[in-house]
Amino acid sequence: MSFASEFKAFALKGNVVDLAVGVIIGAAFGKIVDSIVNDLVMPVVGAIFGGFDFKDYFVALKEIPPGVPHALDAVKKAGVPVFAYGSFLTIVLNFLILAFIIFLMVKQFNRMKRAEPAPAPAAPPEQVVLLREIRDALRR
C-alpha cells in the first residue's frame, strides 16, 4: 500500500472526520462563550467592582510614565510590564462557563442514552429451538 493511499485511508476514517467536525464546532462555540463573558457577564461584574471593564484590571510592575492613561492597552503600548490579572480572570471565567455548558450537554446526552430501553433479544432460529427440544428430550 502506498503512502498516499495509507494517508487517505487514515484521513477518511470516521473518527478523524468526527474529530475535525468537533474541533470546528468547538472553536465556534468558544467564540460564543467569549462573547457571553465579555459582552454580558463581565460588564455586570465591572459595574459591581468599580464601573469599568474587569479585563482592564492590572498592576504595573514599573512606574507608569506621566501622561500615559491608566488603561491596560495604553500602559502596554508605553512598554510598561504589567500583571494583567483582570484578563486572566476573564479567561478563567470563560473556561468555567464553557466547562459548565459542556457538562450540561454531556449530562443530557447520557440521560438520553439511558432513557432508551434495551432492545428485546431476537428470537432464536427454528433450528436452535428444535435442537434445544431434542437436547431436553435426551436428558429425560
Swiss-Prot record:
UniProt keywords, alphabetically: Cell inner membrane, Cell membrane, Ion channel, Ion transport, Membrane, Transmembrane, Transmembrane helix, Transport
PROSITE patterns according to UniProt: MSCL (PS01327)
A Gene Ontology term for the protein's cellular component: plasma membrane
InterPro entries (UniProt xref): Mechanosensitive_channel_CS, MS_channel, MSC/AndL, MscL_channel
Localization terms from the record: Cell inner membrane
Record-linked Gene3D superfamilies: Large-conductance mechanosensitive channel, MscL, domain 1
UniProt topology in membrane: Multi-pass membrane protein
Membrane-spanning residues: 9-29, 86-106
Listed Pfam families: MscL
Molecular function in Gene Ontology: mechanosensitive monoatomic ion channel activity
Keyword check for Transmembrane helix: yes
Role this protein plays: Channel that opens in response to stretch forces in the membrane lipid bilayer. May participate in the regulation of osmotic pressure changes within the cell.
PANTHER family: LARGE-CONDUCTANCE MECHANOSENSITIVE CHANNEL (PTHR30266:SF2), MECHANOSENSITIVE CHANNEL MSCL (PTHR30266)
Family: Belongs to the MscL family.
Classification via HAMAP family: MscL (MF_00115)
NCBIfam families the record matches: mscL, PRK00567.1-4, PRK13952.1
Oligomer and partners: Homopentamer.
Protein name as annotated: Large-conductance mechanosensitive channel
Organism: Anaeromyxobacter dehalogenans (strain 2CP-1 / ATCC BAA-258)
